[in-house]
C-alpha cells in the first residue's frame, strides 16, 4: 500500500525545498551586499562605514 500514491507530499517537500533555497540565496546576497557596503579596505587600513562617519577600526579596540 502506497501512503502517497500521487506524490503530493513529495511534490510539496520539493516545492518547499526550492523556496528555501531561493530564500537562502537571497539572504546570502543581501548579507554580502551589506558587508561590502559597510566595510572596505584602503591600503592596509581597515575602515568601517556608518550613516554618520567613516573611520578605521583602531578606536573600536578600546571598547
From Swiss-Prot:
First-listed, main subcellular location of the protein, grouped into a coarse class: secreted
Keyword Secreted (UniProt): yes
A molecular function (GO) term: carbohydrate binding
Tissue and organ distribution: Expressed by the liver.
GO cellular component, one term: extracellular region
Coiled-coil regions, chain positions: none
Subcellular location(s) of the protein: Secreted
Keyword Disulfide bond attached: yes
Post-translational modification: Contains 2 disulfide bonds.
Keyword vocabulary terms for this entry: Disulfide bond, Lectin, Secreted
Described purpose of this protein according to its UniProt entry: Binds to and neutralizes the activities of basic phospholipase A2 (PLA2) myotoxin isoforms.
Subunit description: Oligomer composed of five 23-25 kDa subunits. Homotrimer; non-covalently linked.
Family statement: Belongs to the alpha-type phospholipase A2 inhibitor family.
Protein name: Myotoxin inhibitor protein
